[in-house]
Amino acid sequence: VPYSDPNDLRRLKVDHAYENSERGYVLRNIGSKYNPSRQTKWIPEITKQDFWQLYMNHIQIMKEKFPKTSGRICSYCLKEYSFMRRLGTRGKGYTGQKGQVQTNFSIDRYDSRLTYKYNNVVFCCVGCNQRKRDSNPNDWNNYIRVGREIGYGT
């Protein structure tokens, strides 16, 4: 069976087409949160179906806020996100952040000290998720306080 060969170009093209669709990209992203090979302490407290429902709700809310858009908008920068993967990445695991498309869809934990659960899941772009990576709400309050103290923006 030619498609059983993971390096078969036909299979790579079919996989690539699916993974560059919104559904394929988002489901792979959600599924990665449950991958047993992930070395993480953040085991989601919600199901894959809950993630999908939260995503659909996010789209609806964004469509209401921005009626002339598709609703596929980053919660942080309010720009539309994309769904693009490189050809031939299926089964390769984590391939590093080099070359990641900054506008791609991503799932963030609002408070990075907590796991994926209701009221802690944010749909955003990769760029915003990376910029927020090493901070938490306490840090943000400190940044705002220091900015006010030094007169930033006045």
Model-based region annotation:
Residues 2-10, 89-92:
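Short Lys/Arg-rich cationic patches that frequently serve as NLS/NoLS or arginine-rich RNA/DNA-binding motifs
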Residues 3-4, 43-46, 116, 135:
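Short coil/turn linker and secondary-structure boundary residues
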Residues 4-7, 14, 18-21, 107, ...:
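Intrinsic disorder/low-complexity signal
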Residues 10-76, 113:
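Short, charged surface segments at domain edges that flank catalytic/cofactor-binding sites
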Residues 22, 29, 69, 86-94, ...:
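Intrinsically disordered, low-complexity segments enriched in small/polar residues
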Residues 75-78, 127:
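Short, cysteine/histidine-rich loop/knuckle motifs that typically chelate Zn2+
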Residues 79-123, 132:
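Histidine-centered nuclease catalytic patch
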Residues 115, 119, 123-126, 130-154:
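A detector for short metal-coordination/catalytic motifs
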